[in-house]
Amino acid sequence: MMTTESVASKTSDSTNGTAPTDIPATVARLRQTFATGRTRDIEWRKRQLLQLVKLMEENEAALAAALAEDLDRSPFEAYIADIATTAGEAKYAAKRVRRWTRRKYQLLELPQLPGRGWVEYEPYGTVLIIGAWNYPYYLTLGPAVGAIAAGNAVILKPSEIAAASAHVMAELVPKYLDNDAIAVVEGDGAASQELIAQGLDRVLFTGGTEIGRKVYEGAAPHLTPCTLELGGKSPVIVAADADVEVAAKRIAWMKLLNAGQTCVAPDYVLADATIRDELVDKIGAAITKFTADKPDGMRVANQRQFDRISGYLSGGDGKVTVGGACDASSLRIQPAVVVDPDPNGPLMQNEIFGPVLPVITVQNLHEAIHFVNSRPKPLAAYLFTKRRETRERVIKEVPAGGMLVNHVAFQVSTAKLPFGGVGASGMGAYHGKWGFEEFSHRKSVLTKPTRPDLSSFIYPPYTERAFKMARRMF
């Protein structure tokens, strides 16, 4: 078990004190292990998944300390957002992996009889998971659950931006998991590029759209299939009939969690004009209450993040009604609400990924739907309403990776639903059975008897009788 003291001794430099990984040798080792068939064994998969649960549960303090160092995360938020979610995903898969791997027999058409057909779930081989810094365990070890359940060898590439968390992962994974089949590679973007260049069997990347394109381009020469979990501007539509008090609390909570550095955090709100002022006031009140223990604001990940987000606020776009003070020396930003910024300005054209919440006034639901649909498809879309008709209309008319009504972000943390993007917000999906299937090749298998040879009518020379039989069968 790792101690919190060992975390504190790590530096923020992801390469300091860490021997560089021989990437070709690591890939070769994992490929060799996969070739032996070890990872295909169902009991091996279950053991690795249960060991991952132990890793998360036995090292909670060390994992939380690393998250505090990297992201100023509280122990409670570390637990619910990274530790418990990852462990829960692994427990869920361990209980069901045998069922998931069973052959799925299909009823064949008449021309295919006699015969049996089924789908065989086959692991891809050696796969790469490139994690994100904002939830360094859940977005790296979480996807690994599906990859392990599917029987793959797995390379984990944590983000160098969350350096302490990456170090913890690199130290703990070999102690709990099969190091010849599951390996951690630390490093920056160059390490990711070198890994992709090895021509691995599948890649899952979580991060921004711009880097996602580069990952896709790097994988293309090898025809490596990719799962891309990207981002975008996730809207919240607050209808005129919404429970404004509850909506305000839930929106504020998620915008503050991890300092708003969450891919499915509310990026902006579209508020009906009749409740706009009340909503803004109550979001402001919720922010004030929720941040009483952080009067200096929320710390963002690094200088680049701080400069980008503070730049949105200093641009003078829209009316700042709450917060907005920035301290460059501590990288802290007071959570801000900005009312009616320019829809074509930087604040509304770029994913914010920080504690700044624009609120746009709309006159009706039609205007809100049109506003969302005039922009790239988001990773998540949210709606607050009491009316079934409003709910059904938004579900049907607003394309998004996922949607949640009357709350925010919970669609990501269930193993019973797939999580993924669409269009610019990504491709592919995982969690639960969908993660298993994402990392499995669905191989079609058909078997037929040789005697009696009922296929004789298809052999040349073709007769009129054979032609008549074919017409009846097809």
Give names to the regions the model predicted.
Residues 45, 90, 151, 182, ...:
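Residue-level signal for inorganic ion chemistry
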Residues 23, 42, 60, 244, ...:
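Residues at or immediately preceding the N-termini of alpha-helices
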Residues 1-118:
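N-terminal Rossmann-like NAD(P)+-binding subdomain of aldehyde/semialdehyde dehydrogenases
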